[in-house]
From Swiss-Prot:
Reaction it catalyzes: L-glutamate = D-glutamate
UniProt gene name: murI
Pfam families: Asp_Glu_race
Top EC category: isomerase
SUPFAM superfamilies: Aspartate/glutamate racemase
Function: Provides the (R)-glutamate required for cell wall biosynthesis.
Domain of life the protein comes from: Bacteria
Family in the record: Belongs to the aspartate/glutamate racemases family.
Residues forming the catalytic site: 94, 206
InterPro entries in the cross-refs: Asp/Glu/hydantoin_racemase (IPR015942), Asp/Glu_race (IPR001920), Asp/Glu_racemase_AS_1 (IPR018187), Asp/Glu_racemase_AS_2 (IPR033134), Glu_race (IPR004391)
Sorted UniProt keywords: Cell shape, Cell wall biogenesis/degradation, Isomerase, Peptidoglycan synthesis
Name of this protein: Glutamate racemase
Length: 285
């Protein structure tokens, strides 16, 4: 039987050791816990891999940080994990970090690095009324990269962008067991809700937002389609893993790294266990 053990920098399960098979290690990284939505999609497709989830609760949220800070921070965190584990592949499960740091990561490391981008292309194909909503952080909405996606894949659609950092906070709160205020969601989405022809397809352009899918469907008009990048990222990851030439293997258990252990992080431990993780540790930088 497993029992919980908590130290200054570690929360873990103490259990009778089991012989785990050797398998490739995937690091999934986000500034917060929103990347768990992407991790969950990947794990459903590839359940037998070794997973590390890392989140930067010390610098969260990234939306208000400078580009240089984000690049240096993400490279530093991935480097710190790589020093402790032989990584086969890294997924940057954060839209803000992906649009900024991928070139630097791919230049620094030899393993594949997968990023997430708003699912504008599939949404443009799915819309029936030609009105697509892009729900993301303010930073993602304003990025030139996002505008390029719209220009490339959605010129035939009306794109209504809505930037909200409040939704990120609500998603984090929900994962920690807090009730979500429907009236607060209605207030955030009011620019769309008061339109005579609101979006019939909404791009969830932040990895936190799939965690709020149930509540968003309650507020948005009936039949509104929600589109995110999770499934596409999982398929891309599966293809890359299948085509790696002699990737490094691990027999370790799944674990989570944060940048500081706080009471708030400790409350996440039961949720992280349900996601299949065996320990939560502070990552020294």
């Amino acid at each position: 039987m497993a029992t919980a053990r908590q130290g200054e920098n570690t929360i873990s399960l103490e259990a009778i050791p089991s012989n785990l098979p050797s398998r490739p290690t995937i690091l999934v990284f986000d500034s917060g816990v929103g990347g768990l939505s992407v991790y969950d999609e990947i794990r459903q497709l590839l359940p037998d891999l070794h997973y590390i989830y890392a989140f930067d609760n010390e610098a969260f949220p990234y939306g208000e940080k400078s580009q240089q800070f984000i690049i240096e921070r993400v490279v530093e965190i991935v480097s710190a994990v790589q020093q402790r584990h032989q990584l086969a592949l890294v997924v940057i499960a954060c839209n803000t970090a992906s649009t900024i740091s991928l070139p630097a990561l791919r230049e620094r490391f030899t393993f594949p690095v997968v990023g997430v981008v708003p699912a504008v292309k599939p949404a443009a194909k799915l819309t029936r009324n030609g009105v697509v909503g892009l729900l993301a952080t303010r930073a993602t909405v304003q990025r030139p990269y996002t505008h390029e996606l719209i220009t490339r894949f959605a010129t035939d659609c009306q794109i209504l962008s809505l930037g909200s950092s409040e939704l990120v906070e609500l998603a984090e709160a929900k994962l920690q067991g807090e009730a979500i205020s429907i009236s607060e969601l209605q207030k955030i989405l009011r620019p769309w809700l008061r339109l005579t022809e609101p979006p019939d397809t909404v791009v969830l352009g932040c990895t936190h937002f799939p965690l709020l899918a149930e509540e968003l469907k309650m507020v948005l008009p009936e039949g509104t389609r929600l589109v995110d990048s999770g499934a596409a990222i999982a398929k891309r990851t599966a293809w890359l893993i299948a085509n790696l030439d002699n990737p490094p293997l691990s027999t370790d258990r799944n674990l989570v790294y944060c940048l500081k252990i706080t009471p708030k992080v400790a409350t996440l431990w039961p949720i992280l266990q349900r996601y299949g993780f065996n320990s939560l540790e502070k990552l020294p930088l």
